[in-house]
Amino acid sequence: MGFLLRREEVLNVEQLQGMLDDSPVRAAQAILIAAKEGVVDAQALLGQILLEGRGIARDEALALRWFQIAAQGGHLMARNMAGRCREHGWGCAIDETAAAREYRLAADAGLDWGQYNYANLLATGRGVAENPQQALALYRQAAEQGHAKSMNLLGRYLEDAQVCPRDLEAAVEWYRRSAEAGDFRGQFSYAAVLADRGQVEAALAWLRKALAGGNLKFLRTAHKALAAASDPQVRALAEAYRQRAVSLS
């Protein structure tokens, strides 16, 4: 859907997303106008830039409000983001039960991120009764849609025989797909399998990718695992992970 900007330009939400990199303030103003005119995609995007403070003053409470408005208009990712706000206390008190409701609605409508986030709560019993079987089913649904994080977790369930028969070959395939889709945890999981199979050079390549993309929590955990690795080349990467974690902390 397009809308007028300064009367002479017609922009759509995809163009505005691109403008955010080059002219964030101007883009934010146009997004705000479109959101107020009822453009649902713009309402969801407004929530995102308010959450991040891109081109506009950061306001988590207002971000949540716009996510809710867009969700009421049928925007599934906005529904998912409303759940994220509830789960993490962005602009509101933490309410995992409310987060679970939002995720479930998004998941039931087929959104991969909703399926993933709802599965995370089901797997840990946060905001909802613990149900690892349902969590696994949702991870699988999301993975089959191409959700990289869910691919890695599905692989973990299959490798560890969590509420399902052990299927190592299927696990490795999901790790590979997750790694190739760019998930740093999937890259680390796939590297671990490759290293165990003696394919050290391939494992090192994936470990370097995971190092470049991983967040602080992951790097700290991965550093410990690498430090205990049997292969000296793999073990040597532990220091790079430690240094990267220090730089991010």
For each feature predicted by the language model, list its residue ranges.
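Terminal, low-structured helical/coil segments at or just beyond the last alpha-helical repeat
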Residues: 3-5, 214-249
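Alpha-helical segment of the N-proximal tetratricopeptide repeat
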Residues: 6-37, 41, 45-55
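Hydrophobic face of amphipathic alpha-helices that form TPR/SEL1-like repeat modules
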Residues: 12-14, 45-52, 79, 83-88, ...
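Structural signature of tandem alpha-helical TPR/SEL1-like repeats
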Residues: 19-29, 57-66, 93-102, 129-138, ...
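Short helix-capping/linker turns of helical repeat alpha-solenoids
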Residues: 23, 37-40, 52-54, 59, ...
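Eukaryotic tandem repeat interaction scaffolds
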Residues: 96, 112-193, 199
